[in-house]
């Protein structure tokens, strides 16, 4: 509490020197001023001499000697505070006494305490400690202040302040007493109040346990042992014993999900309970269950749905693709297949599949896969895939484990065209069943329960038997439950929480990045709102959105690598050297927020509509309210509310429409603007689904559609980058969508869970390798 450097003391001794008194008494009488009425705390240091003749008080610059016991013979020189330039002389015989500044300040500090002005008292005592530590009576006065201040904190319910104050007093004087109450007894009372609040009211068992352990280390021996810690330690042990008994019953009944939760509670309450560790570890080994906190609910799992975070996440559990994106690479991404490996030739003219047997010795035959590849190239068949048919020329079975596909022309990413769900090809149903690791057992408003498929093939030792996704509408609550062990993993962090956790280096939470950012933009439905067909109107909208400000608020004023405003809905990567940024054109600058320009462009748009109407001799179209649809997640809600408010400033009414549970789009397109957060793993492959004719941000702009087509047809990376530059320029100039920002994404888990990697594309990408550990250190 005390010990910080006081501003009031800076340069105090520079003004001091030894003076010999030689002044005229009459001159001293002229030094009194209105300064007397100011608090000593608010003034520069000075001493006071009191004259015998009339008892008058006169302020002088501080004496060098700070002792009241000085030789009172002869005369002294002094400089009056009212006239420091001239030395005055006075005989000691004329002086009744000298009041030193620190004595006066101490008396004032004591008066502050009596008046319960504790902030002022603290400042005064702290100044005395810094500048005048040898002031007589200072330490006893501070002890009294600390005790009275602690009593005040207790009365106000500010128990944490009370305990820190009492601990400081205890460190100064363990035997301090006042009014029949000792510092130790009051400390024990306050500790009991805090522990009761933590245990009974807040159920914050880790904080209570940590407090007991800390206080035991400090006061836990002999007469210094706190009765409160003994009492509440016993309560925690008793609660943990109750949980242990319940856990054993649940295990006997094979109610494993409930057992997992009770086990977590037991370990959170008192992990050192005899037998607790062994029982918790046995529970996990026999039937491991992972509880994942999610902030976006899943509607229909789909690992390929780029605009639906929850669908992609859950889709990895219930669906697999023929070819899967694993991670970014310098030229496109790395791909693999559940059936084996897939790679292209150096000249981009051939694609090879090498099939392998699973852990049970079962392997898809090359003939079965070959039939599917041919079926996807057959325009008359039910499994036709236009993008695959455009490049596949011939399928050759080289042997029972290897297939070669000859391409019509060079194609830089032919494997990307085969991200097709296994379930879309029924002839492989027998093989597909073993590829789906989990199925949905329950799906409610609050949770989704996944259970391991009995036929699923695992590459890991003991993957989760069940996975329980718990929905949180509140990021803060989700993070709290992660810290307390109520959930094992939080699948997505709010940007500000990510930045804070990384800055703080929190030991109780492990934060890891995803490989891919999300790009956020507003898709336009021009068919529904006439004004959206006007470029000037779209320019007005983008100029009116304070994208930098919204992003800053999402980050709570912090910085996070890769989070930035963008000029097109294309991944910009975390840095200029990020391989994922190959499609982004850094030469195109983002339009900065300028409400003035927004108003001007709004006037231009209205003028253009009026001119057209005048030529047609009809009324111009009415400016109807814009309907801005958005998913239910916090980021979208937060951003869209600000955007809607900003549109009002240029005279555009905006109505917000929250989509249903787990929805990221409205199939009926009953909106004018749609907030989209897309995860683009491979721009070459995904751009068509993003802004193509049937994409999320589809447009009738012929140039956009032209460049999307040219990208799909490109035969070299050079051509791809060139076409992306042109596409980027077109999207930016014509505002075919309203780009917002890019967010780098992170997830978090409690310590003690293994197999969760950095830079995964999907949280469940390596779920077979997860190892759950209930070690109590997870919660410390």
Question: Where is each model-derived feature located?
Answer:
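Structural transition elements
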Residues: 561-611, 630-638
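Gly/Pro-rich hinge or "lid" segments in bacterial periplasmic/extracellular proteins
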Residues: 313-314, 320, 327-329, 400, ...
């Amino acid at each position: 509490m005390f010990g910080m450097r006081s501003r009031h003391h800076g340069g105090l001794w520079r003004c001091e020197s030894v003076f010999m008194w030689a002044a005229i008494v009459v001159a001293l009488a002229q030094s009194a001023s209105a300064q007397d009425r100011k608090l000593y705390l608010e003034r520069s240091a000075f001493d006071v001499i009191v004259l015998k003749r009339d008892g008058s008080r006169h302020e002088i610059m501080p004496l060098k000697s700070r002792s009241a016991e000085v030789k009172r013979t002869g005369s002294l020189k002094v400089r009056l505070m009212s006239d420091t330039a001239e030395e005055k002389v006075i005989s000691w015989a004329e002086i009744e006494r000298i009041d030193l500044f620190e004595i006066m300040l101490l008396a004032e500090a004591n008066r502050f305490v009596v008046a319960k002005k504790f902030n002022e008292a603290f400042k005064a005592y702290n100044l005395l400690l810094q500048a005048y530590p040898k002031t007589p009576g200072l330490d006893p006065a501070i002890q009294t202040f600390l005790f009275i201040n602690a009593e005040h904190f207790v009365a106000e319910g500010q128990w944490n302040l009370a305990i820190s104050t009492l601990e400081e007093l205890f460190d100064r004087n363990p035997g301090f007493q006042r009014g029949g109450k000792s510092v130790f007894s009051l400390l024990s009372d306050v500790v009991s109040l805090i522990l009761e609040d933590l245990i009974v009211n807040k159920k914050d068992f880790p904080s209570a346990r940590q407090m007991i352990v800390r206080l035991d280390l400090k006061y836990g021996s002999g007469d210094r042992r706190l009765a409160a810690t003994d009492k509440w330690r016993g309560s925690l042990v008793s609660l943990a014993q109750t949980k242990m008994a319940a856990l054993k019953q649940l295990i006997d009944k094979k109610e494993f999900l409930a057992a997992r939760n009770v086990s977590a509670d037991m370990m959170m309450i008192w992990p050192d309970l005899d037998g607790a560790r062994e029982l918790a570890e046995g529970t996990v080994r026999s039937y491991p269950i992972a509880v994942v906190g999610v902030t976006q609910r899943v509607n229909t799992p789909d690992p390929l749905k780029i605009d639906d975070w929850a669908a992609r996440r859950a889709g990895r559990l219930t669906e697999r693709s023929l070819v899967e994106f694993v991670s970014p690479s310098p030229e496109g991404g790395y791909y693999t297949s559940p059936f084996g490996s897939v790679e292209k030739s150096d000249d981009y003219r051939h694609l090879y599949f090498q099939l392998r047997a699973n852990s049970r010795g079962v392997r898809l035959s090359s003939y079965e896969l070959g039939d599917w590849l041919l079926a996807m190239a057959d325009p008359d068949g039910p499994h036709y895939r236009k993008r695959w048919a455009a490049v596949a020329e011939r399928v050759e079975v080289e042997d029972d484990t290897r297939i070669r596909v000859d391409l019509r022309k060079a194609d830089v990413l032919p494997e990307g065209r085969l991200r097709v769900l296994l379930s879309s090809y029924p002839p492989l149903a027998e093989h597909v069943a073993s590829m789906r690791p989990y199925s949905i057992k329950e799906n409610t408003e609050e949770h989704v329960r996944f259970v391991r498929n009995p036929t699923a093939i695992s590459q890991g030792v003991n993957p989760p038997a069940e996975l329980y996704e718990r929905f949180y509408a509140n990021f803060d609550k989700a993070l709290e439950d992660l810290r307390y062990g109520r959930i094992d993993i939080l699948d997505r962090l709010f940007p500000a929480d990510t930045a804070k956790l990384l800055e703080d280096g929190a030991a109780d939470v492990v934060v890891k990045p995803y490989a891919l950012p999300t790009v956020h933009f507003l898709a336009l439905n021009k068919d529904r709102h006439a004004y959206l067909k006007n470029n000037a109107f779209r320019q007005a909208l983008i100029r009116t959105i304070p994208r930098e400000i919204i992003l800053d608020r999402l980050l709570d004023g912090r910085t996070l690598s890769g989070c930035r405003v963008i000029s097109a809905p294309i991944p910009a990567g975390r840095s200029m050297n990020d391989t994922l940024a190959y499609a982004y054109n850094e030469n195109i600058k983002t339009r900065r927020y300028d409400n003035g320009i927004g108003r001007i462009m709004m006037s231009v748009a209205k003028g253009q509509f009026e001119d057209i109407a005048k030529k047609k001799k009809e009324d111009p179209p009415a400016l109807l309210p814009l309907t801005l649809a958005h998913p239910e997640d916090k980021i979208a809600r937060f951003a869209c509310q600000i955007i809607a408010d900003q549109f009002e400033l240029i005279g555009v009414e905006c109505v917000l429409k929250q989509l249903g549970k787990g929805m990221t789009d409205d199939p009926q397109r009953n909106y004018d603007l749609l907030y989209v957060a897309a995860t683009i793993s491979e721009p070459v492959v995904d751009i068509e689904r993003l802004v193509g004719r049937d994409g999320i941000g589809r447009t009738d702009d012929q140039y956009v559609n032209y460049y999307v087509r040219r990208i799909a047809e490109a035969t070299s990376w050079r051509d791809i980058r060139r076409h992306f530059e042109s596409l980027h320029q077109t999207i930016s100039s014509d505002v075919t969508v309203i780009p917002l920002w890019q967010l780098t994404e992170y997830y978090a888990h409690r310590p003690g869970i293994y197999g969760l990697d950095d830079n995964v594309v999907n949280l469940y990408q390596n779920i077979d390798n997860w190892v759950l550990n209930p070690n109590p250190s997870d919660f410390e």
